[in-house]
């Protein structure tokens, strides 16, 4: 569920703030599921303090940016279950204001997109490790390195220095999804507990209503 959840957030961010060119390049295949999306905020030295983001973006003559930095705890940050991964990355344009007021949002594809719309050459973004987690093991959580070989190509979403505003579009979508996921997990846990209690035979009721051991669901502590 986490992979389409994040992809949906990327779709919403591009629909809201992306240029016509970005929409034409990425939306169709994100919506179809051929490509997946990620959300890149957290950094090793900053944690969730986005004011301390150091990933930098250097403007290029063609209107693109070169992205340099490290992002951690990236859900579905690396996998081969889709043709391309479209990373939405918070970074600071060189010379931007300090703090959260100087953060911008960029599209950084795993593979560059060719004129025919298909994935082309590998972009300069690489997975350097996968987290070993206690749970949610079907979802790869990655550390991503941008720009080790000259700079990852990124494309500005919306306007410079408004990245946090745009990222909240993704974050709010994710919050709704995680809330629904929590309700679903709790409901499933309850159903399994009830089924177990109905099948588990454990001693006779203290009120003597049964002569032999019965299901533990009749125990006062379980009722």
Could you say what each language-model-derived stretch is?
Residues 34-36, 52-54, 62, 84-86, ...:
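Active-site lining segments that contact anionic ligands and/or coordinate catalytic metals
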Residues 45-48, 78-80, 97, 133-140:
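Short Gly/Pro-enriched turn/cap motifs at secondary-structure boundaries
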């Amino acid at each position: 569920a986490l992979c389409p959840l994040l992809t949906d957030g990327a779709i919403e961010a591009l629909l809201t703030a992306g240029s016509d060119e970005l929409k034409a390049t990425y939306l169709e295949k994100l919506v179809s599921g051929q490509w997946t999306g990620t959300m890149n905020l957290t950094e090793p030295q900053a944690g969730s303090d986005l004011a301390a983001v150091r990933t930098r973006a250097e403007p290029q003559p063609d209107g693109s940016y070169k992205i340099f930095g490290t992002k951690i705890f990236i859900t579905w940050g690396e996998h081969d279950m889709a043709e391309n991964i479209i990373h939405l990355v918070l970074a600071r344009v060189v010379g931007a204001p300090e703090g959260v007021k100087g953060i911008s949002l960029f599209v950084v594809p795993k593979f560059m997109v060719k004129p025919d719309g298909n994935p082309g050459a590998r972009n300069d973004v690489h997975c350097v490790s996968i987290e070993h987690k206690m749970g949610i093991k079907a979802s790869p959580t990655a550390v991503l390195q941008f720009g080790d070989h000259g700079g990852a190509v990124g494309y500005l979403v919306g306007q410079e220095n408004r990245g946090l505003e745009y990222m909240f579009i993704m974050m709010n979508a994710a919050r709704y999804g995680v809330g629904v996921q929590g309700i679903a997990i709790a409901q499933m846990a309850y159903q399994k507990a009830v089924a177990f209690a109905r099948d588990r035979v454990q001693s006779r009721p203290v009120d003597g209503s049964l002569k032999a051991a019965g299901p533990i669901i009749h125990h006062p502590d379980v009722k």
